[in-house]
């Protein structure tokens, strides 16, 4: 399908509201967009200025429980993702879902990325999380796991960085991207005094990547790296690096969200179809009040135009 498919996320959160606001703001041609949603859910949260195609996901409007985590909402979220995988659109944009709602519905995935990995990946493809705010980009080497369970090997790093190079070549049209690798430990381990992950895992991976022609730094202290990245972002300057490689979730997300806020876009790479999503959650606390800021959704849609 040669359209951008947009899911509206958890029907009890802000997903439908920000989708409606974003599409009305962007004023895109009707033949470019297909919504994976439910007309009753859309009508509950607002009015679209254009009649975009809608692929209906069953949902009883009596099950809309604004701001609540429910099994019915989790099932709707999951079925929306299944449908978008089935139709294989040009690109995918997903509004936020509640992981605990999907768990209540019996779908034990730690996020939308993991669902896409299961139903879209083939031939050993790996879905990766790349966060983007203009030219400030962060790749996560690990995703939704407890900090004590963060697990890295040289082989994992080699595969993820190789996939990242392909994305920069094909999607961003950057033929020779420059990457900065964050150290795993404080001060990049201080020559093994504060941990050996740099010596045993990261540095061997970097040497092998460099031998393949990848422009990637040795492990560098993350705090210093991200201070410089933030300064470049605020000044609108070209960054020293095309992407920063973070070892675990919060190492990468705290800095980019601190400087870019809701304009941060979550991009799934490594599959045949690029998927983007706002860098925020369901915002149950403000759902149904018509006060949700659509800028994150606008950025997510623009990223795949």
Task: Annotate the PLM regions.
Residues 49, 130-158:
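Ligand-binding beta-strand-loop-alpha-helix segment within the catalytic cores
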Residues 33, 113, 127-128, 136-139:
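Small-molecule pocket liners
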